Amino acid sequence: MVETAARFIEAREFLLRHRDDYDTAYRDFRWPQLDRFNWALDYFDVMARGNERPALWLASDGGSEVKLSFAALSERSNRVANHLRALGVKRGDRILLMLGNVAPLWECMLAAMKLGAVVIPATTLLNRNDLVDRFARGRTRHVIAGADAAAKFAELPGDYTRIAVGGEAPGWHRYDEAYAAAADFAPDGATHASDPLLLYFTSGTTAKPKLVLHSHQSYPVGHLSTMYWIGLKPGDVHFNVSSPGWAKHAWSCFFAPWNASACVFMLNQPRFDARGLLDAIVRAGVTTFCAPPTVWRMLVQQDLAAWKTNLRELVGAGEPLNPEVIARVKAAWGITIRDGYGQTETSAQVGNPPGQPVKSGAMGRPLPGFRVVLLDAAGAEQEEGEICLRLDPRPVGLMQGYQGDDGTLLPLAGSAYRTGDVAMRDRDGYLTYVGRADDVFKSSDYRISPFELESVLIEHAAVAEAAVVPSPDPIRLAVPKAFIALAPGHEPKRDTALAIFRHLRTGLAPFKRVRRIEFAELPKTISGKIRRVELRRREAAARGEDRRGETEFCEEDFPELGAG
């Protein structure tokens, strides 16, 4: 495996060397060609040998901390792997891993990789129906969960291993018994780079989750592109605001930082507290920070300049960031939040890497290792179209495929992988997010991008979140309607609606303007994505019945706005 690992290291060093030179990195980077490769054994353990630098730093609002070195995590994961093997975990077995941000989460990920087992990451928010689905379609053989979550599994049928973390549960093995296992680990055979490693249940906004299968190279090696986008360096302290169970956690709390030999920092808060988070960034000396738009929007409500940080790189992920938020952070800290784009199915494929010009509203250019094209429904390249990845050559940072309900792998077909997202490309190759392919709609024959309208909406102080959908209209076919979650201190009343409509008139061309707004709680998936499909259905039904919401306002309600 030494030669294979050397190829991975060579690719890593190339990207670290050219972290500020996008043109060279994109032109000359080649994915390492791997046959047999186990990232935990062939890279992490080798890098961790005698390495007492911090690898994992877990903090809480209460002041408690856990800090583990690379060497300690390597040894602890060896012990866990030996313990799991003794409990019957075999190569290819599926392990449902449902833990919060506690050290055993990272130990189990490494241990499962060493064993050749397949991890099904799961959020602690799952209910019984979610678990039944993961047992049935995921073919779960073993469960590692917090002792306080054991009751969720009480009525689930099947013969599966139960391991409880953080306490005792009747009928469950105690996780802490693993620390008494042998400190040396010997694999039972070679791991092929194409062997399965992770099975994600995606949080679809329209249907039941798809099953995304990743291999021992598609995420561990593929996230070299994520490392490059973030701008990570050896010795960095990287903080990514994310919950376990979602792909972004593996992206930026596991593979990308450890590919760069950086320390993963996490803050556990019972309830989100912006000031507490900012205090932790200062206290831990965080150098690179990634957060979803929702968190950034809450952070900019603070006087950010009052926190003197060691931050060098700021990135946003999950959904594109609105220009207003980027501008506020730049004014406070002198650092530009750089957007990026990827999916559960891929590593980071588009982004603004360090040292490159950032265009307002653009999510960046294709990252090294990805050939990104915009295609129409017929497969022709366009300046605006669906974001697609060319498969010749196939990028390493792309899933093996979707697993069918019967357990078979549904491989990708054709010459390109279609993401389902739409973007526009400018003359310099920068891509600007338009929306999900099924979210974009027409009004009076004009194409409307919900994201563009939502970006203008949240610039208003009263708007915490917004989702724009088509509202059936007898004249224009459809007009943009915004469902708005109000910021604290604002009431769902006429004056608020009038202020928002006035703001929209200054920020949008007449054909793009939101004509109807409704103050409401936004429906979301378990991962926090807005379920626009539900809002579209709700709006279509309301218009079909000529029904209007109690907190809904239309432009025509306000004669003081004038014509337009």
Where are the predicted features?
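Conserved AMP-binding A3 loop
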Residues: 66-71, 197-221
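ANL superfamily adenylate-forming
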Residues: 62-63, 148-193
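Conserved ANL (AMP-binding/adenylate-forming) active-site segment centered on the GW(Y/F)…HTG consensus within
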Residues: 334, 393-420, 437, 450, ...
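Conserved AMP-binding/adenylation subdomain of ANL enzymes
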Residues: 220-237, 244-287, 302-303
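Conserved pre-ATP/AMP-binding loop-to-beta segment of ANL
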Residues: 52-54, 170, 180-201, 207-208, ...
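Conserved ATP/PPi-binding loop(s) of AMP-dependent carboxylate-activating enzymes
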Residues: 366, 378-410, 448, 542-544
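AMP-binding/adenylate-forming catalytic core of the ANL superfamily
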Residues: 126-127, 143-146, 289, 415, ...
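Gly/Ser/Thr-rich phosphate-binding loop
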Residues: 259, 286-291, 300-359, 371, ...
